[in-house]
A protein has these predicted regions:
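Core SAM-dependent methyltransferase catalytic element
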Residues: 196-197, 214-236
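C-terminal alpha-helical "lid/dimerization" subdomain adjacent to the S-adenosyl-L-methionine
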Residues: 148-196, 200-212
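Conserved alpha-helix/loop element of class I SAM-dependent methyltransferases that forms part
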Residues: 27-45
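N-terminal, positively charged/glycine-rich alpha-helical extensions of SAM-dependent methyltransferases
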Residues: 1-19
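A short acidic, Gly/Pro-enriched loop at the edge of an enzyme's catalytic core
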Residues: 95-108
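A short glycine-rich, Lys/Arg-flanked "PGG" loop and its adjoining helix->strand segment in the class I
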Residues: 126-142
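Class I SAM-dependent methyltransferase SAM/SAH-binding core
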Residues: 49-97
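A short SAM/SAH-binding and catalytic strip from SAM-dependent methyltransferases
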Residues: 107-127
Length: 236
């Protein structure tokens, strides 16, 4: 399963299930808690880039001056309402943001994106994460913030994911609509910080009773997945 194959499956799945996904993140308690954390992090930001937006705003758009919503699939996402007045859509891949102005944004946010950047192997998937973070750092102004909201797992579960990744990804690809994912421990995401960026904040977002797993509401206590906010500051 190549990165290109994963991108296509992500497009098909999230385009088809956009309305249901919006409803779930709007009503499930885990994402209500997540929204409060995001709102606090973006409040007062002048220029915000939301990379991997997918047509879903998991925060109050009024808290930022202007928002550039970036996604590879924006042209294929049906829109049931007009965008907020301060939002500009841009079609681009997080793995290649060459068409996006460099050193332009005060903050860049990625919400539940990194675990979807899977490749043929677990190693290729982590390379995609590194590339995505580097691309996002390039469009940040000096002293800008890279805000990552991500589903993480304990190290023991990550080792399990690595051991079964290729057969599990093949089975998922053949059997369900949702694309395969690879979740990382918090320490691994901190480890792959882009050059010139320093960790400013790591905040655990308390799980509620329900959390999405492969697009399906799932009891929070039955999964090791843990939402977290990680903020990098561009220092160079």
């Amino acid at each position: 399963m190549t990165t290109q194959t994963t991108e296509k499956k992500n497009q098909d799945y999230f385009s088809k299930n956009l309305v249901e996904y919006r409803a779930n993140v709007g009503r499930l308690d885990t994402y209500q808690r997540q929204r409060a954390v995001i709102d606090a992090l973006i409040a007062g930001t002048d220029k915000l880039a939301d990379v991997g937006n997918g047509g879903v705003f998991e925060y109050s758009t009024a808290l930022a001056g202007s928002i550039t919503a970036i996604d590879l699939f924006l042209d294929g996402i049906p829109r049931d309402a007009s965008l907020p007045a301060n939002v500009t859509p841009v079609q681009a891949s997080v793995l290649d943001l060459q068409g996006v102005p460099g050193e332009h944004f005060d903050a860049v946010i990625m919400i539940m994106l990194l675990h979807h950047l899977t490749g043929k192997t677990a190693s290729a998937s982590l390379d995609n994460v590194r590339k995505a973070l580097l691309q996002c750092a390039k469009i940040l102004k000096p002293n800008g913030r890279l805000i990552i909201i991500e589903s993480t797992v304990p190290r023991w579960f990550y080792w399990f994911e690595l051991a079964v990744y290729r057969p599990a990804a093949w089975i998922i690809d053949k059997c369900i609509d949702h694309p395969a994912t690879l979740q990382y421990p918090i320490a691994k995401l901190v480890e792959v910080a882009p050059p010139g960026c320093a960790v400013e904040l790591v905040e655990i977002i308390p799980k509620g009773r329900w959390i999405l797993q492969f697009g399906v509401p799932f009891p929070g206590w039955l999964t090791p997945a843990q939402p977290v906010a990680i903020v990098f500051r561009k220092t160079a």
